[in-house]
Regions:
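Pre-Walker A (Motif I) flank of P-loop NTPase domains
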Residues: 170-176, 201-202, 308
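Pre-ATPase regulatory/linker segments immediately N-terminal to the P-loop/RecA-like helicase/translocase core
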Residues: 1-36, 40-164, 239, 244-272, ...
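C-terminal, active-site-flanking charged/polar segments
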Residues: 73-90, 95-99, 212-224, 228-246, ...
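Conserved helicase motor core of SF1/SF2 NTP-dependent helicases
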Residues: 201-202, 210, 315-332, 336-617
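Hydrophobic residues on the short alpha-helix immediately C-terminal to a glycine-rich phosphate/catalytic loop
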Residues: 169, 191-195, 217, 349, ...
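Walker A/P-loop
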Residues: 171-191
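Conserved P-loop NTPase motor core of helicases/translocases
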Residues: 193, 203-329, 364-376, 427-434, ...
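N-terminal pre-P-loop "Q-motif" helix
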Residues: 154-172, 187, 312
């Protein structure tokens, strides 16, 4: 194993003190809740359905808020427990626990599950905290500590960088950098499958911060093992009660339960929530809910020691940290979206650790503003890769399979130091080439990357925080109609996505799409789009001079938006775009154009075929 870096006790103590203080500060600030506006509120018994729009820069609606709490007017008027979050629709389903539902348009505060409390309790154990701090200092002496190999030749079609990534697990700490379209999850699945099959006594802990990421990662490993057809199949288990039952319908071997109906029973139980006003009935309902949760957790723990690979969320791992034991390898997927304090904590569970993610896309979110909170909770472990001891332990996947060459070049030059390229085999793939060839339309030519000057500026939004631009919203609707008709698109939502960083602009675009009979759900905010891809992406930055779009985090949003596109990327330009680093760079290769106004007006009078969509969600 690696040699520990000699560190004075006072240095250990100082680091522990600073990280503890950072967690406490973030816990204190986050306990106030993330601010949202509640709209479209309906009630069925004790279940509330509502659309939430963010009121703060850090108010991101995703599934990590499940099992959190919602309060309004300081929780003196009412509160609810979050049952489920549908990020694509900005919808939350919650169980009313006190008071009356919030009023339309009122301010509500969402408190995430008390994950930080569990993290803080781990750091308040003096011995454990000192061990984690020592692990952090030892990064300066990172080295190869495992002399075995993980074969990659057992799989066909791996690219050179993917093959190189199989050697990462030999290092004490390593990083798999997966830019968009490079097949990070696919690679990770094959790496871990080969590792488990060829090293039958080793155990792996697979972590991620969201249930969706955990599901997709373990399914990738399971698929790869299926391809290998080993004589003895390694035991993989997905722990936790928040897995997606549909994904695991034909994968019962991944569910660590003797009574495999427990998860279904829990979901069905949530469909029968009584009105909290019926106190006794509600009390019994909560008792049964807790009984089912405890039964799932108890059975999970009984199966833990049998698992060669245990997959779970970091939230579950934080609460069950003491029961997890030690693993030969800890793999942290989407690690670029968690803070360094969390990453170091869970790294302690393994002899070796592999962090996988993309530091150029969405970063961890911390609400408190102090330097230590930013360093330990607002920066990902990928910040460590600049150290000389970690450079050789980092592998970037450099061939992508999604974007047409001009889009790929733009993303590569802007965000990946010109290292990302179209996968070599695709140069001979006629089907792929045809699918990435942009056809002309009434408004555009055959370019893959198009910059459209809206000849207008952003305005402060009336109903929501942020900005909106009516002129660009109209042009976006015309461009959608143009491509549906010119490209004979049957399902708009399958082929086109409209991305914007501002909810106000999303609502305005949704309204314009509705007038031309296009699905309002074609429009999305950038945060919700990570992980998706479409043939055509229209990106509307709305206010290119705002720090939210032009700052460091804004550039990450731009990267996410650009890299969703397969065949055509259309970028709307408002006044001030010349000051935006990415937009001004792009304009040098792709000169902005002004759309023909008469053709735009004609397209806006067109009604697309099909049933009229429902009003925006």
């Amino acid at each position: 194993m690696g040699i520990q870096v000699a560190v004075r006790q006072d240095e250990i103590t100082d680091l522990v003190t600073r990280i503890r203080a950072a967690i406490r500060e973030e816990l204190n600030v986050s306990s106030r809740g993330l601010p949202f506006r509640a709209w479209d509120i309906s009630r069925a018994g004790a279940v509330l359905h509502m659309t939430l729009t963010p009121e703060g820069r850090n108010s991101v609606l995703d599934e990590t808020l499940e099992e959190g709490r919602i309060g309004w007017e300081g929780e003196t008027t009412g509160s609810a427990e979050v049952i489920s979050v549908l990020p694509a629709l900005s919808v939350v389903n919650a169980c009313l626990t006190t008071g009356q539902p919030p009023k339309e348009g009122s301010l509500v505060y969402v408190n995430p599950p008390r994950y930080l409390e569990a993290l803080l309790s781990l750091w308040e154990d003096g011995t454990r905290a000192a061990e984690i701090a020592q692990w952090i200092f030892d990064l300066g002496n990172n080295r190869i500590v495992w002399d075995k190999k993980v074969p990659f030749s057992v799989f066909n079609g791996l690219r050179p960088a993917q093959e190189r990534s199989f050697s990462l697990v030999r290092w004490k700490t390593s990083f798999l950098w997966g830019p968009p379209g490079t097949g990070k999850t696919h690679t990770l699945g094959r790496l871990l499958a080969s590792y488990l099959v060829h090293h039958p006594t080793d155990r792996v802990l697979l972590l991620s911060s969201t249930n969706v990421a955990v599901d997709l990662a373990i399914l990738a490993v399971d698929d790869a093992i299926k391809d290998l057809k080993p004589a003895t199949r390694p035991v993989l288990y997905r722990f936790g009660s928040r897995l997606d039952p549909k994904r695991f319908q034909d994968r019962k071997h991944l569910t660590p339960l003797r009574n495999r109906q427990l998860v279904d029973q829990l979901r069905q139980h949530y469909e029968t929530i009584p009105d909290p006003a019926e106190a006794e009935l509600y009390r019994k309902w909560k008792q049964e809910r807790d009984r089912l949760r405890d039964a799932i957790r108890k059975e999970n723990l009984e199966f833990l020691s049998k698992a060669r690979l245990a997959a779970m969320t970091t939230t579950l791992a934080a609460y069950d940290f003491a029961n997890l034991g030690k693993f030969d390898l800890v793999v942290f997927d989407e690690a670029s979206q968690v803070g360094k304090a969390q990453a170091a904590t869970f790294a302690l569970l393994g002899k070796r650790v592999l962090f996988a993610g993309d530091p150029q896309q969405l970063a961890p979110i911390a609400q408190a503003a102090s330097p230590d909170v930013n360093t330990w909770l607002g920066q990902s472990p990928f910040e460590w890769t600049s150290r000389s001891s970690l450079k050789n332990a980092t592998c970037m996947l450099d061939e992508q399979w999604r974007m047409a060459p001009p889009i790929s070049n733009a993303v590569s030059n802007l965000f990946y130091g010109s290292r990302l390229r179209v996968a070599d085999p695709l140069s001979r793939d006629e089907v792929w080439i045809r699918g990435r060839s942009a056809m002309p339309s009434r408004l555009l030519g055959t370019q893959n990357v198009v910059l459209v000057d809206a000849c207008a500026g952003a305005r402060a939004a009336a109903r929501f925080r942020g900005y909106e631009c009516e002129e660009s919203a109209l042009l976006v609707a015309a461009l959608v109609v143009d491509h549906v008709l010119s490209w004979s698109i049957a399902d708009v939502r399958e082929d086109i996505i409209v991305l914007t960083p501002y909810r106000a602009q999303r609502r305005r675009i949704e309204a314009e799409l509705t007038t031309v009979n296009a699905p309002a759900s074609t429009a999305s905010t950038v945060h919700r789009a990570q992980g998706s891809e479409r043939r055509i992406v229209i990106f509307d930055p709305v206010c290119p001079t705002a720090d939210f779009v032009a700052g460091e985090e804004g550039m990450r949003l731009v990267n996410v938006a650009f890299s969703r596109a397969q065949c055509r990327l259309i970028v709307m330009l408002q006044r001030g775009w010349e000051q935006h680093p990415a937009l001004s760079f792009l304009a040098k290769q792709h000169p902005p154009m002004v759309l023909n106004r008469d053709r735009v007006d004609e397209l806006l009078l067109t009604k697309l075929p099909g049933p009229r969509p429902t009003r925006p969600a």
